[in-house]
Amino acid sequence: MSTQRVFALADYLQPSDQEPVRSVVSRTQDTAIVAWHVKPGQHLPAHSHPSGQDTWVIMSGTGIYQLDKEGNTKIIKAGDVVIAPTGAVHGVYNHGTEPLVFAGVVAPAESGFELLG
């Protein structure tokens, strides 16, 4: 078991011109902590985690966050904490001019992943 308790999020960001890359910062049985770097014009497609909650802490940038399967949205920005309860559909589109950077915490780590569609 790792004893590291402090992580620099910037060390895990992986900008990509294709699609955003999910970089695992830390993973235990209880949680998976991931770093996201979403370039302007990129998106994370609408999805859900059938067995767990997904919480995002927005570090920089802005995005259009999908709140449900009906397509309702809300603007998210640096400083926001965004929670998708168990089974809730969510996704994000970076409509801004700078990268959308956030840390995501999925609990439990094995929460499943289902794309909407």
Identify the residue ranges that each predicted region occupies.
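Conserved hydrophobic/aromatic beta-strand scaffold that supports enzyme active sites
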Residues: 24, 33-37, 55, 73, ...
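Ligand-binding loop in jelly-roll beta-barrel domains
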Residues: 64, 77-78, 86-112
